[in-house]
């Protein structure tokens, strides 16, 4: 029983010696030195005579329970560093941090600390010696490989002024850090580290019946040391006025100029016993590169936006970039501030055969051109004054509602927003909710109440429950507008004076249309009560479509309304499928109602938008079914004829006067 223990003790002691020899030969000793060849654990090393005295404590071990831990330290010996030279450490970002200078009291920098120990308190059940020996072979080969890829391996024979050295000490005694920078002392500040400055590695232990053999190592993660000559006189001066140097670099505008400065503080190199918390500051100048600006083709007037390129720098580095040169004050090409469906930028369509209609409460024969002027107005600048306006000598600024909403009422924008730009909101929601859209409240507002165009859009803020209804497909309507050559503005690339003059002439020409349509403008401004027929003639057909409710003068009515008490009149119920324009909801049968004779007329007192004027709830039909135009016409009139006998039981709805705007109507004006 004693013999197996002696053999196990012999294997353990030789493992201690083999580990120390592998570390020293990889760091400080000559790997091909002279001495007796050691073939333990199938790994050839040399028994150096210099290590005989240092390893005497472990060579003379008889009892494994009393074997002390072995610590093998690898340190950087700075005893030969010249006076005035400084040793600096480079981090992963390329920044240099001062370690010590030649002639100081700190002459050693600990890089690695290996620990080999035998713990008798932890033991296993394996007693087979060959198995333990094979495990020791694997462990020695692992150490032999790891030790050559650690950070300190690159410092071997790097400089004659600082060399690698090793020290074997008893791990059971405290280790003094006097005159050296210990392993726990960080050189790079913690806030600059992406990882800890010390890393630990533990190898797989070997369990025996007497105890456990353990090997571990702690080492610095940064070991890229650099020697700086005459640093105190050449480099330290740059720390005093870093901002002045930075301004000089910016003024010169050099493409590649890098200054790295490492301040030095003597107080940062106290011993571990003094527990100094101070760390040297670091000032670095990154290479200067001229700032690259991308060419902006379009820029809004008054915009303060300035794009800048930022280079990633270290947290404590002082990096400067030159101020960007002032921009040229050249005229930028103007853009149209439409968010969806810009009228000014829409390409003309191949053909204009499709008929476009709009439903706005106004006189049919006098409102087409004014409405077209309203829709053309956003294509010009909103700040161009129009001289020679009708009825006043002062220039009038053209205005347009901030939001032209669809049947859902979305797209409302606050009037206090930064840009006074109109936008056409699209409604892609449920079709069922559109049926009740003509009772929705529209919040669009006109900032200029003296609009020279004189359309019913000017009453959007004065009449409750009023608004401009535009269907989803705004792009089709835009293409129809652009197809008319007389409606398109010229986008000349000439000077600013000719472009503004051209826009001024076009706006002034369409502004003169107010004299031809003064009746519609007066009706909007006067906001008189609207009268309508209480019953439809047998040959007339009306549809339930959204419209803008405005009050017209009594004189504008083709038939004066008798002063009778309000009474419900028969209503012809339209078919379930009705014609819907891709751009604006309208009806094609309203033109027939102007010439048909009326048999019974009743008067509805009050605004057409007031729900109290109707005795029963309104009945709305779905007008947004997108079917073929020809099929809608035939199905519409056939359904009207079939439902004629049943429509007498329904009351009037809140539809106002409708008019039809087609391509032919626009061409006349």
Curated annotation (Swiss-Prot):
Residues 559-571 have a biased composition (Pro residues). Keywords: Autophagy, Cytoplasm, Protein transport, Transport. One of its GO terms (cellular component) is cytosol. It is found in: Cytoplasm; Preautophagosomal structure. Its main location: cytoplasm. Disulfide bonds: none annotated. Residues 423-437 have a biased composition (Low complexity). One of its GO terms (biological process) is mitophagy. Residues 438-458 have a biased composition (Polar residues). Residues 239-288, 305-354, 406-458, 530-581 are annotated as: Disordered. It comes from the Eukaryota. It holds the Pfam family ATG13. Interacts with ATG1 to form the ATG1-ATG13 kinase complex. Belongs to the ATG13 family. Fungi subfamily. Activates the ATG1 kinase in a nutritional condition dependent manner through the TOR pathway, leading to autophagy. Also involved in cytoplasm to vacuole transport (Cvt) and more specifically in Cvt vesicle formation. Seems to play a role in the switching machinery regulating the conversion between the Cvt pathway and autophagy. Finally, ATG13 is also required for glycogen storage during stationary phase. PANTHER family: AUTOPHAGY-RELATED PROTEIN 13 (PTHR13430:SF4), PTHR13430. This is Autophagy-related protein 13. It comes from Meyerozyma guilliermondii (strain ATCC 6260 / CBS 566 / DSM 6381 / JCM 1539 / NBRC 10279 / NRRL Y-324).
